[in-house]
């Protein structure tokens, strides 16, 4: 299924990595998106199975600048989390459910990944998964730079440089650019996967898919 139009194509060509010679897997998600957490092992398998493909993460922005608390969204999230546990077998820590001081703003987590990608592009998916773990397993404060600096340190990044970049207007702008790119691609839900091949963009997944199914779609 192609999602390309001339207008979108011309706009997207400003992103140099979309002009790569090799086919490209584009994963669009948000580290605090429930089904993106469930999808993490599947997209990892896809990446590992297609070493001849370029791989890029685009941050979609689930609830940037969100103001609702985990108490506000607790029942809704708990329902989805139980579905994800049943479908994937992944563990989830429910400790944050019902916390009226925990604000569900996904922009800082997305920005944390954008900065890590700038400093060390090859870790972007692993860093994405580490941010997911901070939320879904460790119940870390996802608006605190300390959370992301700790992750950066584990990846061997210069934490002083990371903190400076994380708090910069450039990082905020680059994060918004990812959100805008996802919108330009026509993405309205996460996780989504787009394949770029021969200058065409094809929607391979809009929502959770097993890696086996996704690989079949990509190979067709």
PLM ranges: what are they?
Residues 1-21:
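Bacterial Sec-dependent N-terminal signal peptides
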Residues 9, 22, 98-101, 137, ...:
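Generic anion/oxyanion-binding catalytic loop in active/binding sites
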Residues 12, 17, 48-52, 118, ...:
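Secondary-structure boundary motif
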Residues 28, 32, 39-48, 133-220:
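C-terminal cap of thioredoxin/glutaredoxin-like
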Residues 37-138:
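Structural alpha/beta surface segment adjacent to cysteine/selenocysteine redox centers
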């Amino acid at each position: 299924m192609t999602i390309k139009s001339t207008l979108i194509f011309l706009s997207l060509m400003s992103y140099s990595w979309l002009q790569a010679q090799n086919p490209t897997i584009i994963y669009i998600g948000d580290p605090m998106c429930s089904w993106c957490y469930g999808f993490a092992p599947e997209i990892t398998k896809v990446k590992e199975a297609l070493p001849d493909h370029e791989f890029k993460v685009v941050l979609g922005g689930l609830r940037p600048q969100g103001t609702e608390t985990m108490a506000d969204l607790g029942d809704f999230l708990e329902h989805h989390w139980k579905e994800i546990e049943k479908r994937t077998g992944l563990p989830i820590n429910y400790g944050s459910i019902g916390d009226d001081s925990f604000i569900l703003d996904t922009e800082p987590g997305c920005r944390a990944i954008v900065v890590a990608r700038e400093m060390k592009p090859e870790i972007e998916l692993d860093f994405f998964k580490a941010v997911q773990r901070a939320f879904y397993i460790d119940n870390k404060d996802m608006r605190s730079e300390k959370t992301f600096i700790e992750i950066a340190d584990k990846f061997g990044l210069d934490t002083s440089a990371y903190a400076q970049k994380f708090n910069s207007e450039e990082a905020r702008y680059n994060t918004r650019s990812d959100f805008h790119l996802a919108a330009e691609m026509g993405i309205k839900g996460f996780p989504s996967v787009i394949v770029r091949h021969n200058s065409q963009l094809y929607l391979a997944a809009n929502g959770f898919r097993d890696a086996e199914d996704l690989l079949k779609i990509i190979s067709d």
